Design a protein with these regions (language model features):
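Hydrophobic alpha-helical transmembrane segments
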Residues: 50-64, 83-93, 137-156
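Individual transmembrane alpha-helix segments
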Residues: 77-116, 191-200
């Protein structure tokens, strides 16, 4: 009998620990979602075409710039394996290989993010069901730490941060484009990637604030609920005492 009770207790402890792990997956899901969203958010680039005066800088028309940028984004986000072939601009073998590597990286991130989507949903349900709202505060803090920590190297030397990023995620230096052989790089200036990084950090800050807002609201509702239960228990106690007397 004791063995059965202990087994049930151990199983419950394991499930609770597993559930807590799903809560910790929420910040990862938010970060990956923010990265994928910004990569696919073409209006930011359209804004930069004018803001960075790319037509004058590159000598290409606005339509050509947008068309080739759209191709790069669509190619990288598409799960279908096709040959990389820009509509208007030539590409070197190294350039083609790099975009294939980017596509592979993004496709892996998308698959991983689907996994974190389900674990995050479970984590949110677990947090609300068990009324462990302090987990939402923890999620908020963890998300907020990312922009805080990344903003420092970005502000000090964004190019160096950009270089470190490529060295971490790519095994070669094919990302170092020569505009003579890969003119696509001329329409993808460093400033655009900086704006994209800032956009990601802003989104993360907003998500952090949203989770903290939920934490405060749910915590307050829990206090109200506990207060109501205590008042009801007090009334029942008083009623019971009167009945005995």
């Amino acid at each position: 009998m004791n063995k059965i009770i202990n087994d049930k207790k151990n199983k419950k402890t394991f499930l609770d620990k597993l559930s807590v792990l799903t809560v910790h997956s929420i910040p990862i899901f938010i970060i990956l979602t923010s990265v994928l969203f910004v990569f696919s958010f073409k209006p930011l680039y359209y804004f930069d075409i004018d803001h960075l005066d790319l037509v004058r800088v590159t000598g290409y028309s606005k339509e050509l710039i947008a068309r080739n940028y759209n191709y790069v984004v669509d190619y990288c986000l598409s799960p279908i394996n096709t040959n990389f072939n820009l509509p208007d601009l030539p590409s070197s073998n190294n350039g083609i290989t790099h975009f294939k590597d980017v596509k592979k990286l993004l496709q892996n991130l998308i698959k991983i993010n689907f996994l974190f989507l389900f674990t995050s949903i479970y984590g949110i349900i677990y947090t609300i069901k068990k009324e462990k709202y302090e987990y939402f505060k923890l999620v908020s803090v963890n998300i907020f730490l990312v922009p805080v920590l990344l903003s420092i190297p970005f502000a000090l030397n964004f190019y160096k941060s950009f270089e470190v990023f490529h060295k971490i995620f790519f095994r070669n230096d094919y990302w170092l484009f020569d505009s003579t052989y890969d003119p696509i790089i001329s329409i993808l200036p460093e400033e655009f990637f900086f704006h994209s990084a800032v956009f990601i950090l802003v989104i993360l800050i907003l998500f952090s604030l949203v989770f903290y807002f939920f934490y405060q609201k749910l915590k307050d509702s829990l206090y109200v609920k506990k207060g109501s239960n205590n008042e009801r228990d007090d009334r029942n106690t008083i009623t019971g005492s009167k009945s005995k007397s």
